[in-house]
């Protein structure tokens, strides 16, 4: 392929991926379906359900048009291929055009089916209909959802493609093509998994993401998973009526201090171990008096007199958890991004040390 064709292909691929997954830069620039079609979609705050009925349909149609947009662009970027003349276009490009036309055609048929009887066939409307009283329809349930969404005390978090919204009555997950809805009184919530990420793109700090399974007692309501930062777990529990069950292997860190202690321990584990002389007996940690002392401060600089760290001559007196809590207590709470690289004084002799100087004893 020649240079213009390659350049356009790469540029369009990047645009298509960003348009579908919408990073923060695209949101800031207004290059989203919600912003481009805001006049037709209306306001989410004013009418949550009607907004997402139209948004999911518009998103499906716009995304299905991306292959056709690529073909039209290639007609201009690679004019020598004569793609605009179907009879002269290569066989592979004609097959691609067939696919590019088929996708939006199927999307249009599906959207038409959804919109029948005032959107009664839409998956969101059909889910709401499961909660409707015999003498009312799904519109009455939608009105209740709209009212609760407008309240300022709702719980809302997550990225635009996987938002989690909890109101007084409803648990909802808003994705690119669908809105999952379940009634609080009918659901069982279970924390099934926790994943530790070393760095958060927003704060350069470790972050723990929880996977919570939302399963309704009504078999007709499809179960779904929501993803949540562990620091928001407590706020979610306050909004829910029922307790959240937890799998046996899942440990939840609800505070920044919990996350730091786990990271602190993992970093200390890779430091060189300190061998305790056979004549020395380890005593109980003077911080908690519950476990034996398990760490020793050893300056790791090659030259003992150089660097900001200082040699500590104290015997092992602290356990790993208490030393981590001491380290965290000496940090600036407004600058958590500096915690791992900082130096603090020894709790006993005040010699300054960093995380690299904390060694486990053996």
From Swiss-Prot:
A zinc finger (RING-type) spans 285-350. InterPro entries: TM129. It is found in: Endoplasmic reticulum membrane. It catalyses: S-ubiquitinyl-[E2 ubiquitin-conjugating enzyme]-L-cysteine + [acceptor protein]-L-lysine = [E2 ubiquitin-conjugating enzyme]-L-cysteine + N(6)-ubiquitinyl-[acceptor protein]-L-lysine. The chain crosses the membrane at residues 7-27, 57-77, 95-115. Its EC number is 2.3.2.27. It comes from the Eukaryota. Residues 1-6, 78-94 are lumenal. Its main location: endoplasmic reticulum. Residues 28-56, 116-362 are cytoplasmic. GO terms for molecular function: ubiquitin protein ligase activity; zinc ion binding. GO terms for cellular component: endoplasmic reticulum; endoplasmic reticulum membrane. It is a multi-pass membrane protein. Integral component of ER-resident dislocation complexes. The RING-type zinc finger domain is responsible for E3 ubiquitin ligase activity. E3 ubiquitin-protein ligase involved in ER-associated protein degradation, preferentially associates with the E2 enzyme UBE2J2. Exploited by viral US11 proteins to mediate HLA class I proteins degradation. This is E3 ubiquitin-protein ligase TM129.
């Amino acid at each position: 392929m020649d240079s213009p064709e390659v350049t356009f292909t790469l540029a369009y691929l990047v645009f298509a991926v960003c348009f579908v997954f919408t990073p923060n830069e695209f949101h800031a620039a207004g290059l989203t379906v919600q912003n481009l079609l805001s006049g037709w979609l209306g306001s989410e705050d004013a009418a949550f359900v009607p907004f997402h009925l139209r948004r999911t349909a518009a998103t499906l149609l716009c995304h299905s048009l991306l292959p056709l947009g690529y073909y039209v662009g290639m007609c201009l970027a690679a004019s020598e291929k004569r793609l605009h003349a179907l009879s002269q276009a290569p066989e592979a490009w004609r097959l691609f055009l067939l696919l590019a036309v088929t996708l939006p055609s199927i999307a249009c048929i599906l959207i038409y089916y959804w919109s029948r009887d005032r959107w009664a066939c839409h998956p969101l409307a059909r889910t709401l209909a499961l909660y409707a009283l015999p003498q009312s329809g799904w519109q009455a349930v939608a009105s209740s959802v709209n009212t609760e969404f407008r309240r300022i005390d709702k719980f809302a978090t997550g990225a635009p493609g996987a938002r989690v919204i909890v109101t007084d009555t409803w648990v909802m997950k808003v994705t690119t093509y669908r809105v999952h809805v379940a009634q609080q009184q009918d659901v069982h919530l279970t924390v099934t998994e926790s994943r530790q990420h070393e760095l958060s793109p927003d704060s350069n700090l470790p972050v723990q993401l929880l996977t919570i399974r939302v399963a309704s007692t009504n078999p007709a309501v499809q179960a779904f998973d929501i993803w949540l930062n562990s620091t928001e777990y407590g706020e979610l529990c306050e909004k829910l009526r029922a307790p959240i069950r937890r799998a046996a292997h899942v440990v939840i860190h609800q505070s920044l201090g919990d996350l730091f202690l786990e990271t602190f321990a993992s970093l200390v584990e890779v430091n060189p171990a300190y061998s305790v002389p056979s004549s020395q007996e380890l005593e109980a940690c003077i911080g908690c008096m519950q476990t034996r002392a398990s760490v020793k401060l050893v300056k790791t600089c090659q030259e003992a007199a150089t660097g900001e760290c200082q040699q500590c001559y104290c015997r092992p007196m602290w356990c790993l958890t208490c030393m981590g809590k001491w380290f965290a207590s000496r940090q600036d709470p407004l600058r958590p991004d500096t915690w791992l690289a900082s130096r603090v004084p020894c709790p006993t002799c005040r010699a300054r040390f960093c995380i690299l100087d904390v060694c486990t004893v053996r």
